[in-house]
Amino acid sequence: LPGHHRVAEMDDEENVPKPAIRDVRKVNESTLCVTFSDDTKCHFNSVWLRDSCTCTACVHPATRQKLLNSVKIDPNIQPLSWAVEGGETLEVCWPQSTSSPPHSSHYSCDWLYQFAKLFETKDGDPPEVSDMFYTNTKSSTILWNRDEFDENPPELEYKTFMEERSGLKQMVKNLVKYGISVLHGVPPHEDELEKVAARMGYIRETGYGQTFDVRYNADPKTHLSYTGAGFSHHTDLAYRERAPGVQLLHCLKAADPAKCGQEAGGKSFFVDGFYAAQWLRYNYPEHFKILSTTPVMFSFLDAERERWFREAWPVISVDYMGKLKDIHYSLFSMRPPLLPQDKVATYYEALRLFAQRVERTTLQYSFYLSPGDLVVMNNRRILHGRTAYDPTKVDRHLKGCYMDLDELKSLYEKMRKDDAL
């Protein structure tokens, strides 16, 4: 699969000479063209350059919040002068109000060069920039299937996670890279879930409260997950205005399949939705485009509170650069898309291709949850579910909660930065 491994630690090319600024010239009233030592050229808009200044007058040195008011920049601004310092820095002098002296901005060659690669990209995946204002550097995801986790599962011990900094870092690294991490040896007590969440950040409360229980409930109005029915691949709460980024599930009770027979069911499975989406993108690009541009309604009746929740998302979401961002997938809350009738068949064909790939056993990381297991997963990347089980044979009780994904991503970024100091 192209793009299968995007390991952030290997993103620095060795033995490649650093670029230098060779020439800067004015192309027109609003544009400077920078030529680099490898003959790369890039056009930079003057308003964009002025807005990108990071001096202490434009960006607060401690909080890194912008002090420069973007909307007050003259849309017709032109540089008064510019100079290149040793091929490494471009200095540009900008006009200000009549009562203020010109403003001087400095842009490093490395900084300009990475945007040159981004702005001039015509085909393929655009490169990431390493500017902290735009991206969590060193955060590339690693796509996976069952074979990868058979050899190296993203698992660690509860004691290591709770007591050692390296354990905490491994947990959030697994989540950022693979979208999933599994703790073993968590005490099977109801309050342990909140302790695990607090070790990383804050619980996100939902209509189910701070935490919720997943266990058999004979009430016919109950959620499907509270029955013994099979629960197919899905992401949670796609019908909310913003589906939670992270889900935690702590197993408090589970029958031993060796004692009750595996036919009793209740086996959990997890699939990398990004892997399936990337496969679709490379093998069926038109179908990928359909699933990434067609909003579909997700809706759910909270029978206990008698409230409907509705939100529309494409099954596959990409960011402004075309990179995979989110998966929203839940066949029991997805409604038929509202499309012109001549486009319906192709939509369902695209959905079928994605579903068939997701359901392949070669993509599934599956196991029987045991008391003391706790799964942490990216809820907008990892599709999860379970096989049907017989509630007369299997006493199954999971405790769950949600968190915000950016809390954990920012924690990992900080820990990496601290380790580099």
Q: Where in this protein do the model-derived segments appear?
A:
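Motif-centric detector for short Cys/His coordination patterns
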Residues: 1-161
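Active-site environment of non-heme Fe oxygenases that use a 2-His-1-carboxylate facial triad
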Residues: 135-180, 184-421
